[in-house]
Structures are given as structure tokens and as C-alpha cells.
From Swiss-Prot:
Residues 198-229 are annotated as: Disordered. Pathway: Amino-acid biosynthesis; L-leucine biosynthesis; L-leucine from 3-methyl-2-oxobutanoate: step 2/4. Keywords: Amino-acid biosynthesis, Branched-chain amino acid biosynthesis, Leucine biosynthesis, Lyase. Residues 200-215 have a biased composition (Basic and acidic residues). It catalyses: (2R,3S)-3-isopropylmalate = (2S)-2-isopropylmalate. HAMAP family: LeuD_type1. CDD domains: IPMI_Swivel. It comes from Bifidobacterium adolescentis (strain ATCC 15703 / DSM 20083 / NCTC 11814 / E194a). Its EC number is 4.2.1.33. It comes from the Bacteria. This is 3-isopropylmalate dehydratase small subunit.
Length: 229
């Protein structure tokens, strides 16, 4: 996962509260089997309106989303964060986030920065005065700077540490790779009758044998060949 320490980019004012995950990405797009390519689905219904903020040329390259309170409520679809990230947003600022959405942001390289609603209103005012304006978010200092205005934001220490180091869940697990390998080696020696759980890439290719073939001496082949299915 890409590290996030300081980000300077176009800030987009989203003057809407109670934005739920179905508004961020409709359920119809959840049928996709990949984790990327959801940028076209972000705010899909709203983007059909020519006046929607993301349809304005000055916000096409938005990287920082300044949203209203209670952002990311609703169902716990991780796709909502994927869509924001794929579109280009690395930071979402709000006065309140849904808990599950907040947790998903850190796992996917997106900062959910919490600021008082008064600070959000001030940022909206500054952005309305100069559409397409850039802001700087410093995760190291926990500040947002827009022009001459610098405001603090909240982020817990653990989330800050993950984002600044670019650690997703797999990265965190691999920090204990030596311990995992040692345990699996011990497990294989002590309990040889149990299946191994090492990654497939560490195992030689094994021939696949039918369990039925060993269980039934009269096994004649696939069920289809025997007229059973």
C-alpha cells in the first residue's frame, strides 16, 4: 500500500450530510470480482446530474474530499473506500464518520480526517471562493492547510502509523512471517496428519486425486459418464 505522509491536491467540497455507502457506490457495482476499477461507480447516481460537484471541470482532479457530517453510514461495503481511492481521493474530511467505514479507510490507504463542523464550514467557504483550490494535508503534523489557514484534525495513533508506513492487513501479517513459518514447520512435524497451511507458492505442485476413487473400488469415472448427473 502506498505511504501517505503529506498530500497536496485539489479539494472538493461535498456539501451533503448523512452520505451512505449506497450513495457512494450503488449495490449493482458490487458484483464485480476485482478490487480495482470502481472510479466510474463513485457517486454514480449523483454524477448523472450535470451540476454535481465532480462534474465541474475545476474538480476533475480532486484528491481531497471535504464532506458533511456522518459520512460513510449504511451497509459495511468496503467497495465504498475502493471507489473513493480509485477515483483519486486519498483524504476524506468530515466531522463524523461511520465506524466501519472509518476502519476500512485505513486498510485501503485513505485518510479519514475528523474536524469540527465549524472547521468544515470554513474550508467550504474558502473552496467556494476559489473553486479548484489546492489544500495540503499533513499526516505527520495532523493539520490541513488551505491558503493562510491551518487547521488541526483528529486521527488515532494506530491509523496514522499504518498510513504513514503504507501498511495494509497483508503487510502487517508479513511482519510476523518468520514466526508463521516456524509455527507451520513445528505444526507439520508434531501433527503430520493435519493438512499444511503454508501459502501455495511455497508448496510443490501436487497431483489432484479424487477422494471417491479411493473410497469406492467400483469407481468408474466422473458422475456424468455414469449417467448419474
Amino acid at each position: 500500500m502506498e505511504k501517505l505522509t503529506t498530500l497536496t491536491g485539489v479539494a472538493v467540497p461535498l456539501r451533503r450530510s448523512n452520505v451512505d455507502t449506497d450513495q457512494i457506490i450503488p449495490a449493482v457495482f458490487l458484483k464485480r470480482v476485482k478490487k480495482s476499477g470502481f472510479d466510474d461507480a463513485l457517486f454514480y447516481a449523483w454524477r448523472r446530474d450535470p451540476e454535481f460537484v465532480l462534474n465541474k471541470p475545476e474538480y476533475k482532479q480532486g484528491k481531497i474530499l471535504v464532506a458533511g457530517p456522518d459520512f460513510g453510514i449504511g451497509s459495511s461495503r468496503e467497495h465504498a473506500v475502493w471507489a473513493l481511492h480509485d477515483y483519486g481521493f486519498r483524504v476524506v474530511i468530515s466531522s463524523r464518520f461511520a465506524d466501519i467505514f472509518y476502519g476500512n479507510t485505513a486498510k485501503n490507504g485513505v485518510l479519514a480526517a475528523i474536524m469540527p463542523q465549524e472547521s468544515i464550514e470554513l474550508l467550504w467557504k474558502l473552496l467556494d471562493e476559489e473553486p479548484g483550490r489546492e489544500m495540503t494535508v499533513s499526516l505527520e503534523d495532523r493539520t490541513v492547510t488551505c491558503g493562510d489557514v491551518t487547521l488541526p484534525f483528529e486521527v488515532n495513533d494506530y491509523t496514522r502509523w499504518r498510513l504513514m508506513n503504507g501498511y495494509d492487513d497483508i503487510d502487517l501479517t508479513l511482519q510476523h512471517e518468520d514466526d508463521i513459518i516456524a509455527y507451520e514447520k513445528m505444526r507439520a512435524e508434531k501433527f503430520p496428519f493435519k493438512p499444511k497451511t503454508l501459502p501455495v507458492k511455497r508448496e510443490p505442485e501436487q497431483p489432484i486425486e479424487s477422494a471417491r476413487e479411493g473410497e469406492y473400488p467400483d469407481w468408474q469415472g466422473p458422475l456424468a459418464d455414469r449417467g448419474i448427473i
